[in-house]
């Protein structure tokens, strides 16, 4: 798997590495120079921001499927749900906490849907974990 580093001499983990939930050792980059969402985080391309703090960015989807449609992302580059580690839990928890507050502020007062597409089968288009928040005044239809 790309990004995994081997054990150092004596079987210990190498300096500067992170052990994930499964005991794997990874070196995760803060941002990916080719990732469109990382470019939005860095301010290299515009995004219609909804919210921003040191860990999380929320911005409107450029192809909305409902009157309220925005995405929440961790600022740290994590390609997909498969790549999340325990170290990512605070940012992901913040994302889930913000989803309802921001949805309500943007007009989804009677409910909304959260969607996380993961991998090829899940039709993930951008390889940076993101949560879509979709809502509006009318029911969204069945899943």
Question: What is each residue range found by the language model?
Answer:
Residues 4, 13-14, 18-143:
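HIT superfamily nucleotide-processing domains
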């Amino acid at each position: 798997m790309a990004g995994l580093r081997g054990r150092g001499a004596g079987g210990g983990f190498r300096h500067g590495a992170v052990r994930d939930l499964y005991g794997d050792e990874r070196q995760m980059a803060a941002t990916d120079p080719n990732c469109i969402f990382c470019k939005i985080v860095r301010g290299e391309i515009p995004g219609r921001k909804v919210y921003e703090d040191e860990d999380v960015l929320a911005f409107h989807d450029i192809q909305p499927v409902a009157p309220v449609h925005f995405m929440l992302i961790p600022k740290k580059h994590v390609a997909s749900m498969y790549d999340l580690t325990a170290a990512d839990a605070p940012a992901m928890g913040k994302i889930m906490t913000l989803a309802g507050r921001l949805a309500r502020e943007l007009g989804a007062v009677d409910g909304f849907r959260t969607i996380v597409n993961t991998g090829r089968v899940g039709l993930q288009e951008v390889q940076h974990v993101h949560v879509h928040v979709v809502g509006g005044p009318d029911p969204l239809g069945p899943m």
